[in-house]
């Protein structure tokens, strides 16, 4: 029976250029690599108290009771995939991810989750660039103040299925970029 939850942090992660991997490596090798990546993503989510809802090909959907755990898992996902050896094919390099996180109520039904919060998290993945973690204002507000230092406001945008704009932020996870951003931290929400 469908059941509404309290607010959860919904995280989508998608492996960048996976279609190109199949062309470059062939079906078997590409599928093996993608499965290895999805395993790394799952481990990162579980390490930070996440619940794996499902994996869909080159994508993972998980949720977290705490937004701080979701952001920590997203950073770990990028770092884990970043340790994989680069693909030695022209036009490719390292495996990268697109990650989006939104916080809100969802409907749980049959082990899956549905609702506006899930849709917004999925839209963030579509908006993100490789190696980015995009989050919404709801996630920023749920973070502990000490975890907001690497957050940068990007823009407001209308996403498919929403009548009003959402505020999009980037969570900077790479140390060299974090050093730059911390010189002008997000102060609007502290």
Language model region names:
Residues 1-2, 171-190:
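Intrinsically disordered or compositionally simple regulatory linkers and C-terminal tails
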Residues 2-73:
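Catalytic NTP-binding/metal-coordinating core of nucleotidyl cyclase/transferase enzymes
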Residues 44-71, 84-118:
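Catalytic core of nucleotidyl cyclases, primarily class III adenylyl/guanylyl cyclases
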Residues 121-125:
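Short amphipathic alpha-helical segments
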């Amino acid at each position: 029976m469908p059941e509404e939850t309290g607010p959860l942090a919904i995280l989508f992660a998608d492996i960048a250029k996976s279609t190109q991997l199949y062309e470059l490596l062939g079906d078997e090798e590409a599928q093996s690599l993608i499965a290895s990546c999805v395993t790394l993503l799952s481990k990162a989510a579980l390490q930070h108290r996440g619940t794996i809802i499902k994996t869909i090909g080159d994508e993972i959907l998980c949720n977290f009771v705490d937004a701080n755990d979701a952001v920590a898992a997203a950073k770990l996902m990028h770092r884990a995939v970043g340790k994989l050896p680069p693909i030695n094919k022209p036009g490719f390099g390292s495996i990268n991810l697109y990650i989006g996180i939104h916080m809100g109520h969802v409907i749980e039904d049959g082990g899956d989750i549905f609702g506006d919060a899930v849709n917004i998290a999925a839209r963030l993945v579509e908006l993100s660039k490789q190696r980015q973690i995009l989050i919404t204002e709801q996630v920023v507000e749920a973070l502990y103040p000490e975890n907001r230092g690497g957050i940068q406001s990007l823009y407001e945008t209308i996403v498919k299925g929403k009548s009003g704009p959402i505020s999009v932020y980037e969570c900077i996870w790479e140390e060299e970029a974090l050093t730059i951003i911390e010189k002008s931290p997000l102060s609007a929400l502290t």
